[in-house]
Regions:
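Bacterial N-terminal signal peptides that target proteins for export
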Residues: 1-7
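Glycan-processing catalytic domains of CAZymes
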Residues: 26-420
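C-terminal motif of bacterial Sec signal peptides marking the signal peptidase cleavage site
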Residues: 16-17
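Short, linear, compositionally biased motifs with a strong N-terminal bias
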Residues: 10-13
Length: 420
């Protein structure tokens, strides 16, 4: 090597040694929300919404059409009224417009809203894996949402809808995972295998005293202890199983608890369940913002026949107050997004962020307010606006992580700075 080459080599070493070291990228972890209330608060969530682009219904005549939970039998979300509102199967309209439950931007928006409102986790309204109707899409969407819960810092569990097996049986469509005919009990047992392996194995699955929590919206299909013994035979240790209020007896020793729900007697019914009803098992409280169903106008029968008006946030204040003042440790919020029954906590054109802001205040959420909830919508809008910009999406990834870490001021700087 000649002297000139040596000089260049030494210069290269010197420049390399003097180059500034790249700062390692900060790893941002989710942070738990601090609240005055020590009760666990879980949000009941529907995962059944489909758009024309995402509807993969097993029946070809529904493919490429809006999902039935946006349309029922009378509505068309493509029809927009003079106020810019979609014609959906509800008297209330999500701020985002009608959406696909598996949309990653919708999922991020919804989970961050729950987190910043003081919600500890999600109770997924869950169907069967029976490959009929829209059931496979609900499972797909649930899996998509669940996969993002840890990143945001939310726990979750499953609420099983055994009535869907009854519905499939009424049409002779109960099958196993390979689409071979099987019994209703066998179908439910196979569902429990999937729930055990896919969900209960996750580190953020909700447990009570060390055992996984499982709820049922009923029972409405299986009414004997022997049936539930068989259904639960897949578990090495049986889950802590809650049924609807007053419905646990048919399950025998398999049921350890009951949860309250929405009924026409409203607060009187909640008070009776919390304070008067003598029950040796566990109880779970509930709170809801109202109940106004769309079924009759949607062409799905004659409707429920009663309603509970929202009255602003008055109904929520009434029901949440009863739950917080009870001696029960868990509150289920009913619901995040059952638009057909008008029970949604999700921000709408009609109510804005009212229900989540009220939830923040009543739970005593610290260092967060309604402006932080609105930031979630700003993030969602930015995701959509800059969908084709990988550079901007990377910035929004950081903003999302900061929000999950409760560093909302920093996230706001990123989002507000995008248009500058």
């Amino acid at each position: 090597m000649n002297l000139k080459n040596v000089a260049f080599a030494l210069l290269g070493v010197t420049l390399f040694a003097c180059a500034p070291k790249q700062k390692p990228e900060e790893k941002i972890e989710p942070v738990a929300v601090q609240k005055a209330s020590d009760k666990k608060v879980y949000m009941h969530m529907m995962t059944w919404f489909e758009t024309k682009e995402t509807n993969q219904h097993p029946d070809p005549k529904y493919v490429g059409k809006w999902g039935c939970h946006w349309t029922m039998d009378t509505c068309n979300p493509d029809s927009i009224d003079a106020n810019g509102l979609q014609n959906i199967a509800s008297y209330y309209h999500p701020l985002t417009g009608a959406y696909y439950s598996g949309d990653k931007n919708i999922i991020e928006y919804q989970l961050l809203l729950m987190k910043l409102a003081g919600v500890d986790g999600i109770i997924f309204d869950y169907t069967t894996l029976n490959p009929a109707w829209d059931f496979p899409m609900l499972i797909r969407n649930t899996d998509s949402i669940e996969s993002q819960t840890q990143k945001i810092g939310l726990d979750f569990c499953i609420l099983y809808e055994d009535q869907h097996i009854r519905d499939a049986a009424n049409r002779n469509e109960v099958t196993d995972n390979e689409k071979n005919p099987c019994s209703k009990v066998e179908r439910a047992r196979l569902d429990m295998e999937y729930i055990r392996d896919r969900y209960m194995s996750q580190p953020n699955y909700i447990h009570i005293d060390g055992d996984p929590l499982l709820l049922d919206f009923g029972p409405q299909t299986f009414y004997s202890e022997a049936e539930w013994d068989t259904i639960f035979s897949v578990f090495p240790v049986k889950p802590v199983f809650f049924t609807l209020w007053y419905q646990s007896k048919p399950c025998g020793k398999n049921a350890q608890g009951e949860y309250s729900w929405i009924w026409k007697d409203h607060v009187a019914g909640l008070k009776h369940f919390y304070n008067t009803y003598e029950y040796d098992g566990l109880k779970m409280a509930s709170a809801y913002p109202g109940f106004v169903d769309f079924y009759k106008d949607g062409g799905w029968g004659d409707g429920i026949g009663w309603n509970i008006p929202h009255r602003g946030d008055t109904t929520l204040v009434e029901t949440l107050s009863e739950a917080l003042n009870s001696n029960l440790d868990i509150i289920q919020l009913a619901t995040w997004n059952d638009y057909g029954e008008g029970t949604m906590f999700e921000p709408t054109v009609e109510f804005g962020f009212t229900f989540l802001a009220t939830l923040q205040k009543m739970l005593g959420v610290q260092n967060l307010n309604e402006d932080d909830l609105k930031l979630c919508f700003d993030l969602y809008q930015a995701r959509v606006k800059y969908a084709s910009s990988p550079e901007t999406q990377a910035k929004l990834d950081r903003a999302s992580a900061l929000m999950a870490a409760l560093r909302t001021a920093e996230a706001r700087e990123i989002i507000d700075g995008l248009d500058k």
